């Protein structure tokens, strides 16, 4: 767009549509933009006087009072034209690109939905392709052999038997071409049925919808190159759309400024003289005439119409961009993954973990209370002077037991704070081992307390008995709680193991689906390659059929030329016989003979004819035979003799060319000059025959 969009008055009027210019072109009938990235290069002209000349008559004194020195208005006009052209080209390019991308996405989606799953489909396709190739090879080999045989027979000679065989060969060749066409049509029909069968097989793919949902959900989590590509395309679309909006606003501002400038110059006009100097007229006193006002109004209307059309195109572009974005999002996500079942299982596991945590917290509180009771029991035991050493040893053992109990309590506290570190959360049966260990520790503690109470009696035995009773009760409650917790932990462990098995099964299903997807993709690629090979084979065979048809036409033309030569040779060989049979002996001289007897000529009287080519038959002078004046048979090749009747006048005006059927009949042997119809020719028949041969030879 090196030139301005408003370079002539006819183009400006063509935008508005209110003028009847037969040479104008529609403003929006733009060519298809090329699919290249980036904006088109817009070279700008720096020669403002040259631009002023190109913008005539709009910069003319009678239209707009813009002098050549006023470069600002010229730059405004130039920027308007360049911006309008670039925006239109950009809108066309982006609209075409969005249409192409939408069509490509539709084809890709249909291709994904039409992929076959069974291996029998691939085998059937390969069998059909092999059958098509076999049929085409057989037909081409047969045609090649027939053409070779025909060429060999043509090279042998030009006898009647060869002509008959040639006619049969031509018929067989035509029949062979028809058979080839029929075979191609049948094979293409069969392949079309196979494609329809592939379309039907998409119903089988719908049965794998749940598995594909899982796979699509997993693919959504990962950033694939395709999603990155779509994101880049959408970002590019958004940038171009923003730039288009900015250009649109800029053009609107320029148009408003131009309109204000035109209004100001209309109100304050200074006419320019013929010498280029401004005349001393007061501004505003000299009003424009009606013609200039109409032209300025048309100019503004044309600009506003272009502005409105650009707005409509921008709206269409935004609509297509939104549709394309929706389509890209739908294709990248494929289908939304419904994970209600998995979320429900996760919620159940979370609730079970919370219940287990609460139970462990309660158990920890009970163990802490039991610890406090045991600490108080240690100080209740009074010292005895007699058994002080024994009591000290028992107290040491008791301290060890209390330390072990503290370890158990600390372990339960850590499990309550962090249930994930629990041994039974991953392995079934580990919780039962922990419960057994805890029970053994409690039993050992109970036995030691009983032994201490038996060895060291004290006046506070009632208190000790109550403490032991409370300890037994607490022990029983703890045992019940531990057993209940063990069962719960076992149940949770079993459920976690089942959940792990289910997750592994889902992982295996996903891997299997990925393998199936890879197989389907490879099958689709193979089918595409086979289809391309079939198309190339079909095009090659079509070219071979065309070449064979051309060869047949050439053979037919050669046959026609050979038949013409044969007819000429036959007529040349029959003319002496016709002329000799036309000279009858008068009946008066031979009254005794009832049959017509031709005059016998001595062999010495006939002088050998001059050999001439058959193309010289049109010139009757070249075919004169040198005979004596008394026994001269022909005056020319036309067969006109002094003793024979003259050719009818109708033969002179007969300019028709013999048809193909007559030539074929003459070539086969059913013409009047063939050996099957030889008879005694009368003088009238001979004359008629000579007239026909002359007319035919003259037209050859």
Swiss-Prot record:
Composition-biased stretches (Low complexity): 273-284
Presence of keyword Cell cycle: yes
Keywords: Cell cycle, Cell division, Coiled coil, Cytoplasm, Cytoskeleton, Mitosis, Phosphoprotein
One annotated GO biological process: mitotic cytokinesis
GO cellular component term, pick one: mitotic actomyosin contractile ring, intermediate layer
Polar residues bias locations: 1-11, 43-53
Region described as Disordered: spans on this chain: 1-53, 266-293, 634-659, 671-700
Phosphoserine sites (modified residues): 636
Any coiled-coil regions, as ranges: 496-575
TM helices/strands, residue ranges: none
Primary localisation category: cytoplasm
Subcellular compartments: Cytoplasm, Cytoskeleton
The organism's place on the tree of life at top rank: Eukaryota
Any GO MF annotation of the entry: cytoskeletal protein-membrane anchor activity
Chain's role: At the onset of mitosis, forms a medial ring structure before the arrangement of the medial actin ring. Essential for the central positioning of the division septum before the cell divides.
Subunit description: Interacts with cdr2, mid1 and sad1.
Protein name per its UniProtKB record: Mitosis inducer protein blt1
Organism name: Schizosaccharomyces pombe (strain 972 / ATCC 24843) (Fission yeast)
This protein's encoding gene: blt1
């Amino acid at each position: 767009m090196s030139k301005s969009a408003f370079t002539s008055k006819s183009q400006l009027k063509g935008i508005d549509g209110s003028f009847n210019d037969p040479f104008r072109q529609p403003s929006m009938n733009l060519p298809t933009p090329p699919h290249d990235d980036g904006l088109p290069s817009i070279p700008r002209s720096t020669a403002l006087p040259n631009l002023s000349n190109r913008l005539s008559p709009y910069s003319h004194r009678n239209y707009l009072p813009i002098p050549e020195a006023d470069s600002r208005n010229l730059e405004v006009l130039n920027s308007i034209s360049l911006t309008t052209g670039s925006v239109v080209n950009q809108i066309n390019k982006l609209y075409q690109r969005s249409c192409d991308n939408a069509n490509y996405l539709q084809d890709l989606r249909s291709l994904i939905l039409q992929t076959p799953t069974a291996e029998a489909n691939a085998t059937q396709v390969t069998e059909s392709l092999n059958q098509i190739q076999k049929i085409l090879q057989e037909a081409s080999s047969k045609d090649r052999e027939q053409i070779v045989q025909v060429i060999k027979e043509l090279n042998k000679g030009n006898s009647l038997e060869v002509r008959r065989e040639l006619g049969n060969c031509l018929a067989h060749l035509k029949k062979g071409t028809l058979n080839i066409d029929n075979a191609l049509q049948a094979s293409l029909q069969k392949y079309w049925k196979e494609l329809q069968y592939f379309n039907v097989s998409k119903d089988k793919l719908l049965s794998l919808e749940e598995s594909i949902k899982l796979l699509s959900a997993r693919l959504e989590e990962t950033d694939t190159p395709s999603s990155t590509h779509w994101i880049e395309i959408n970002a590019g679309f958004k940038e171009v759309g923003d730039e288009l909006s900015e250009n649109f606003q800029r053009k609107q501002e320029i148009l408003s400024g131009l309109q204000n400038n035109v209004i100001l110059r209309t109100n304050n006009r200074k006419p320019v003289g013929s010498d280029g100097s401004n005349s001393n007229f007061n501004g505003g006193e000299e009003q424009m005439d009606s013609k200039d006002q109409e032209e300025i109004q048309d100019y503004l209307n044309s600009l506003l119409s272009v502005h409105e059309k650009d707005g409509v195109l921008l709206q269409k572009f935004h609509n297509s961009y939104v549709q394309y974005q929706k389509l890209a999002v739908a294709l990248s996500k494929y289908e939304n993954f419904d994970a209600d079942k998995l979320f429900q299982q996760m919620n159940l596991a979370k609730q079970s973990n919370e219940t287990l945590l609460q139970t462990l917290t309660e158990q920890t509180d009970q163990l802490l209370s039991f610890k406090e009771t045991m600490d108080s029991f240690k100080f209740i035991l009074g010292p005895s002077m007699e058994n002080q050493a024994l009591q000290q040893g028992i107290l040491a053992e008791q301290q060890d037991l209390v330390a072990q109990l503290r370890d158990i309590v600390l372990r339960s506290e850590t499990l309550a704070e962090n249930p994930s570190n629990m041994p039974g959360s991953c392995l079934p049966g580990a919780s039962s081992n922990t419960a057994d260990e805890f029970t053994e520790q409690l039993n050992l503690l109970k036995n030691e307390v009983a032994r201490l109470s038996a060895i060291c009696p004290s006046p506070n035995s009632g208190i000790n008995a109550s403490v032991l009773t409370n300890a037994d009760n607490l022990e029983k409650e703890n045992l019940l709680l531990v057993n209940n917790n063990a069962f719960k932990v076992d149940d949770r462990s079993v459920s976690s193991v089942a959940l792990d098995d289910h997750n592994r099964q889902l992982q295996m299903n996903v891997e299997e689906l990925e393998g199936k997807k890879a197989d389907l993709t490879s099958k689709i690629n193979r089918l595409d390659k086979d289809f391309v090979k079939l198309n190339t084979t079909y095009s090659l065979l079509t070219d071979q059929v065309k070449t064979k048809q051309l060869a047949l036409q050439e053979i037919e033309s050669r046959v026609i030329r050979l038949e013409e030569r044969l007819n000429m040779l036959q007529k040349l060989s029959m003319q002496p016989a016709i002329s000799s049979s036309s000279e009858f002996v008068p009946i008066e001289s031979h009254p005794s003979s009832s049959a017509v007897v031709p005059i016998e000529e001595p062999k010495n009287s006939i002088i050998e004819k001059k050999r001439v080519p058959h193309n010289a038959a049109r010139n009757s002078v070249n075919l004169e035979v040198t005979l004596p004046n008394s026994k001269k048979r022909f005056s020319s090749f036309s067969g006109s003799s002094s003793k024979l009747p003259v050719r009818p006048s109708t033969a002179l005006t007969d300019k028709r060319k013999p048809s193909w059927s007559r030539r074929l009949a003459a070539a086969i042997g059913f013409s009047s000059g063939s050996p099957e119809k030889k008879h005694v020719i009368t003088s009238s028949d001979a004359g008629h025959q000579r007239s026909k041969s002359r007319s035919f030879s003259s037209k050859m």
